[in-house]
């Protein structure tokens, strides 16, 4: 499968009704908050990426794969809303726990440009890779928490 640029309509074409509503909501929110969106076809599925215009960095990715819709949030400002992490569902915390450990934080073995994430949820300390730490499967239970997470990060970047 070749990598190809897609329109938003092409990107959302195969989604079920629940996922479509979620994606449309997030898409509108991101555009209304000054983010630029791109959509592509990749080998492993479809990728939607949103870059924050102020920070010029990706704030989130939407990934449509065979097993469902995933959201990857780049939580660069988690220190500004760390209490929010304590509200995440058990399934979301398990997803964070199973994410890769940050090689740079643990043994200085990764790129110096990658800071990784160092945070706590409850009494548990995490040092995780930024590329899969906050990657969540969208479902009825996780959707409102994912939306709130995106809002927290977007607000923190806008205020910076």
State where each predicted segment sits.
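Charge-dense, helix-prone N-terminal extensions
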Residues: 1-160
């Amino acid at each position: 499968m070749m990598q190809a640029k897609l329109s938003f309509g092409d990107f959302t074409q195969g989604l079920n009704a629940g996922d479509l509503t979620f994606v449309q909501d997030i898409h509108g929110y991101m555009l209304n908050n000054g983010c630029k969106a791109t959509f592509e076809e990749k080998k492993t599925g479809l990728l939607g990426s949103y870059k924050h215009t102020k920070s010029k960095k990706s704030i989130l990715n939407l990934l449509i794969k065979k097993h469902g819709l995933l959201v990857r949030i780049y939580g660069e400002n988690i220190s500004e809303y760390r209490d929010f992490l304590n509200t995440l569902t058990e399934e979301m915390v398990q997803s964070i726990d199973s994410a890769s450990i940050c090689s740079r934080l643990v043994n200085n073995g990764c790129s110096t440009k990658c800071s990784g994430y160092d945070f706590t949820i409850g009494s548990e300390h995490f040092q995780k890779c930024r590329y899969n730490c906050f990657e969540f499967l969208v479902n009825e239970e996780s959707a409102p928490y994912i939306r709130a997470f995106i809002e927290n990060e977007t607000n923190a970047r806008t205020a910076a």
